[in-house]
């Protein structure tokens, strides 16, 4: 049963809240760390994760990690990293966790944080599933200003100024950006997913080039997506003909996979969707990953598909 808990956080010796549920039985079971979105906290968006974890009989924690991302202690800070480390430690102390199967998943602001933790603490995770993530805080600040989205004010509040004009704020933005840390995740199985219409009016707040640039950090040089192709995808909400994908993934249901590429240990999927996270599809892929074993990149079953209206995120 899901419950709200407090757990000890070492960085400032406070107790921070989280939603938590333990797997049943005496057998060691996987742990999923789920992450809230940009403007929310541990009381939002956890129920879909919790339902999936109940189905799989996984341990589950959904930490606060300092709340909405307009606070300096939030938005990819050292507090965030330390609190999530402590969340994993806490569950491993109070529940029977299979240490070879500790997973991380989040979308939007949780996508940002999942990529950040992939880069800053790759040793913690068996695999990471990131959806509609922000990979470059300074660049997203620029994008939000251009789209007249108030998230740029959140970034300025968290970073202590405008990262486009203030050197100290720019440094903060880079430290809080996954793109600065992702090279550390070269050995970690990482699935990055984004809807092609994200970042367009009424369809989402994070343009797909944020996912593309994260993929490019970890991909082999010959597999990286060019700047021109990335800008074409963002502007036109379609895939260039020479990049069209023929792979079918039933786990995405009616949201057709438009582009998919695997390189090294990272996979990028661009699907016909908006600012979405498909929890069942995410957990089905994670469930096949075991530390020390080959990565499973096969498409998922149709049984993993969700109702398309059930997983649209609010940043």
Predicted regions located by residue number:
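Alpha/beta-hydrolase active-site loop
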Residues: 75-95
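Catalytic active-site module of serine/aspartate enzymes centered on a nucleophile-bearing elbow/loop
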Residues: 260-313
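Primarily recognizes the serine-hydrolase "nucleophile elbow" in alpha/beta-hydrolase
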Residues: 40, 92-94, 100-149
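Short substrate-entry loop that stabilizes the transition state in hydrolases
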Residues: 26-29, 34-73, 137-138, 200-202
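Mobile cap/lid helix-loop segments that gate and shape the active-site cleft of serine hydrolases
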Residues: 44, 126-127, 133-134, 138-184, ...
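Short beta-strand/loop motif that positions the catalytic acidic residue
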Residues: 192-194
């Amino acid at each position: 049963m899901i419950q709200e808990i407090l757990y000890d956080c070492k960085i400032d010796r406070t107790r921070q809240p989280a939603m938590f549920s333990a797997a049943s039985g005496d057998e060691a079971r996987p742990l999923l760390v789920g992450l809230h979105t940009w403007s929310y906290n541990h009381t939002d968006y956890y129920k879909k994760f919790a339902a999936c974890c109940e189905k799989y009989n996984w341990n589950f924690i959904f930490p606060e990690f300092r709340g909405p991302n307009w606070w300096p202690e939030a938005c990819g800070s050292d507090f965030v990293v330390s609190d999530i480390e402590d969340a994993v430690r806490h569950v491993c102390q109070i529940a029977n966790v299979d240490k070879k199967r500790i997973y991380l998943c989040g979308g939007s602001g949780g996508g940002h944080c999942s990529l950040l933790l992939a880069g800053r603490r790759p040793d913690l995770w068996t695999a990471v599933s990131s959806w509609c993530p922000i990979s470059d805080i300074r660049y997203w600040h620029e994008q939000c200003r251009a789209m007249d989205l108030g998230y740029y004010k959140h970034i300025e509040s968290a970073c202590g100024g405008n990262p486009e004009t203030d050197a100290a704020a720019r440094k903060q933005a880079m430290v809080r950006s996954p793109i600065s840390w992702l090279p550390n995740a070269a050995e970690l199985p990482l699935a990055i997913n984004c809807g092609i219409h994200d970042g367009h009016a009424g369809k989402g707040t994070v343009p797909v080039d944020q996912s593309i640039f994260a993929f490019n950090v970890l991909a082999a040089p010959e597999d990286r997506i060019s700047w021109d192709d990335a800008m074409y995808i963002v502007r036109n909400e379609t895939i260039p003909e020479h990049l069209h994908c023929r792979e079918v993934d039933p786990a995405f249901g009616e949201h057709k996979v438009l582009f998919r590429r695997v390189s090294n240990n990272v996979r990028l999927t661009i699907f016909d969707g908006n600012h979405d996270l498909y929890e069942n599809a995410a957990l089905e892929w994670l469930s096949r990953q075991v530390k020390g074993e080959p990565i499973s990149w096969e498409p998922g079953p149709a049984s993993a598909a969700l109702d398309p209206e059930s997983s649209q995120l609010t940043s």
